[in-house]
Amino acid sequence: QAAVGTTWTWTAPATDYTGYLVDVYRTKENGTEVILGTIAVDVSSDWTRFPRYGFVATFDASKKVDGVIEKEMAFLNRCHINGVQFQDWHNKHHWPLGGTREHLDEVYKDIANREVYTEVVKKYISTQHSLGMKSMFYNLCFGALDDAVSDGVKEEWYIFKNTGRMDKDSHDLPSSWKSNIFLLNPTNTEWQAYIAQRNDDVYANLDFDGYQIDQLGNRGDRYDYDGNKVNLPKGYASFIEAMKQKHPDKRLVMNAVSSYGASQIAGTGKVDFLYNEVWGDEAGFKDLHTIIKANDQYGNHALKTVFAAYMNYDKAGSSTGEFNTPGVLLTDAVIFALGGSHLELGDHMLCREYFPSTALQMNDVLKTAMIRYYDFMTAYQNLLRDKDTEAEISVSLNCTDAARNLSLNA
């Protein structure tokens, strides 16, 4: 189709959930085509059919500067990111909104005592919506800070490390942070009603599209207030059901940390795709294939998989610098070829489970490669990620012993 001037208009075919690759080229006098550029197009009525998930994690005064948010989101848009997770945006885990339903705080502190500006959160949401992205707020399914009793959280809702009610289960944090996080029973219906109402306060004031639910993996034996052993995976399913019942029009995604509770999460039929945070015991490329195959069964062949796989994790924990470009690209090539997606792009590139960490940066080569890789994943999504497109082939590689042990931390 010929373009006139510097613009080009195209009406997509009516077929839903289809990826396309657009080539922009000119033809020389001898008939040779010269490619000027390429870009992918995703024609889908629902973003969760082929989720390409990003994140934002800093909401301080630096984001109020004109053009900062727009530039960040323009890059995500160019990479076809269609959903964005808001990490560490909340005031308290048991009271996520900064302020009250009736009166929002202009600025409040997150769990690490960083400043969060409500206007920045709102601007991220509105900018994402203007680009066709969806905005998902993050929170644990069972977290409360040390002042929770003053906000109406009851002692009977917690889980404990023993049957004596003396030692609440907790996720301990640095002393400079706001509080440790104390864990509640996700099955407890009173807690479910409480946090669902807090979420209602959020939705009433901030135009989020859904809830990115988190957990903390296998905690070992834990007990409720009455001394009964708690079945956390069953509790996660119950929690998801309760959140969907309270807000049926909002999207839900839940993290399966090291695949813990994955089958129960998927089995609810209430999450929109599957999300796996992978750790050292499942950080090989073969493990990713195993997870995707399992998720496909858990989700009845209907739910896609997004991996939270932190690149150059060890390096980011001990130094600063740049990402290992070949390692990132090889990992993405594997994940995309397996039919998954990689949570990695946001207001920076992700390297640690603490999303605000900016220890490592993308160089220009990696930034350019990200655009090309995400173009490819989007354009060929029907081959890579659609139903019944898996093919088994035999591959033989000659490589060094070191290369045989490639992992996500490459």
What are these regions (language model features)?
Residues L184-L303:
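Active-site neighborhood of glycoside hydrolase catalytic domains
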Residues R52-F55, V84-F86, S135-Y138, Y211-I213, ...:
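Hydrophobic faces of well-ordered beta-strands that scaffold small-molecule active sites
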Residues V34-K92:
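An acidic-aromatic substrate-binding cleft motif
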Residues Q1-D46:
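Beta-strand-enriched, solvent-exposed domains that form extended recognition/catalytic surfaces
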Residues H90-V121, V149-N188, G217-K234:
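Aromatic- and acidic-residue-enriched carbohydrate-binding clefts of CAZyme catalytic domains
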Residues S45-D66, S135-L206:
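Active-site-adjacent "subsite" loops/lids of carbohydrate-active enzymes
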